[in-house]
């Protein structure tokens, strides 16, 4: 059974600072499209202070600053301690529409990490974490164990923290449940030492990615059932965090070139295509700042 938080307040964080909008591929994940309030997902991106300091200190947080960086062929290299996080939040009322088996809001508050914004309570359903521990970054995606279709398409793999290290996709049904993801003793020890709420035991590492593909050229894939499938382009079979973010770049005007920006719609996998990056400087795998107005 999913773990419960000792109290609701102990699993709360600061308010969400992005709007909640209807996802463009709701039907793929069985996500509701009508109701009160209007079903929506709030997707926010956060960066740790080390990454923030590097970006601001080098004037890389404005179009003018990026244009100046391009003019002097500045090589963007985030500090090794840089971390970026993407979290997807769903209003608790919508959670009950999406998964009626949750029964009531009180149960959601026990099973999910929650917060409130503008008098609306949200539950965290998915989490991307990227860390610059190597040149290509380390990419990991996490899902709440109750996410419908959590391991669909690519399966779920965690050789360190999951007692069941490999869960294959259910090819007989889509958006089914995959059960709990009980943690190994080493991971539970780390979580206990960090004084984490037990509610985090309900979140599962889906897999990680550190390179573009295998030695034989087969591209690696990594996608989240909510972030890529419901909010993104609707599929996981051609999703790759590292391949998509390799095209994060800017041209002479401080904005992504048309060819680089166009790759976002194609779910690129495998090694980057050099010609796409012609006339661009890479932004060390970070799209978010480049896409800001």
Regions picked out by a protein language model, each given a short descriptive name:
Residues 1-243, 247-293:
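Conserved small-residue
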